[in-house]
């Protein structure tokens, strides 16, 4: 191989998967600082990819154990929006195929918005089935947020295009005959729950951004309905909306004044 430019070396390293590659053996002997920098970057990327693979494998242990028992339709379930003062609680149920792989998959709260959006599209493309459950602020006020979350989760399961054989749920138990396991911090321990958390989060964020367009004075697209200083000041200045949860403090206290 003739001596390559730094740019050509960069392109080559994007193609090279192993140190055994003859092209890599030539590049590693190239003493130019630019090439050595690229080699160092290549090693770091390989190390990161290996860590992501190990993390993904660790997060697949619940699904793999159930598949070993002959189960195929394993639904991960998670919710988003229990704490906000406005907007719905949104849940998702996701059934993944055995060959599913997205490096870097994690609890949706630990991902950037750009990464969540990208993973959302990838999950949509790869999943066997996705169901979403949405419960309004009015119903939350009627039956309380805990019961509303349960209802949204049951709705998400009902909205799947297949009947799940097992449920992996983030920190909840559901009144259903389907066998289930409740996992504390499940969105960081199970790929199915993690995928569900991303679907639920992106779905709800998009709804809140639409609400932000409808009520520009409230800034919903920024705080997603949570009780930030900006949100509380907007309520004081412009009043309580039908999208607000009247049973949540401090809105409840404002109504009682």
Curated annotation (Swiss-Prot):
User: What EC numbers are recorded for this enzyme?
Assistant: 3.1.26.4
PROSITE patterns on file: RNASE_H_2 (PS51975)
Query: What's one GO-annotated cellular component?
Result: cytoplasm
Subcellular compartments: Cytoplasm
Summarize where a divalent metal cation binds, as residue positions: 78-79, 170
Which sequence ranges form a coiled-coil region, renumbered to this chain? Answer: none
UniProt keyword annotations, A-Z: Cytoplasm, Endonuclease, Hydrolase, Manganese, Metal-binding, Nuclease
Q: Where are the transmembrane segments?
A: none
A GO molecular-function annotation: RNA-DNA hybrid ribonuclease activity
InterPro entries the record matches: RNase_HII (IPR022898), RNase_HII/HIII (IPR001352), RNase_HII/HIII_dom (IPR024567), RNaseH-like_sf (IPR012337), RNaseH_sf (IPR036397)
Main location group: cytoplasm
- One Pfam entry for this protein is RNase_HII
**Gene3D superfamilies given for it?**
Ribonuclease H-like superfamily/Ribonuclease H
Catalysed transformations (reactions): Endonucleolytic cleavage to 5'-phosphomonoester
Source organism superkingdom: Bacteria
Q: How is the cofactor bound?
A: Manganese or magnesium. Binds 1 divalent metal ion per monomer in the absence of substrate. May bind a second metal ion after substrate binding.
Per UniProt, residues of the RNase H type-2 domain are: 72-257
Entry keyword annotation includes Ubl conjugation: no
Required cofactor names: Mn(2+); Mg(2+)
Enzyme class, top EC level, equals: hydrolase
UniProt record, GO biological process: DNA replication, removal of RNA primer; mismatch repair
**Functional description taken from the UniProt entry:** Endonuclease that specifically degrades the RNA of RNA-DNA hybrids.
UniProt similarity note: Belongs to the RNase HII family.
Q: What is this protein called?
A: Ribonuclease HII
Q: Please give the organism.
A: Bacillus cereus (strain Q1)
Organism lineage string = Bacteria, Bacillati, Bacillota, Bacilli, Bacillales
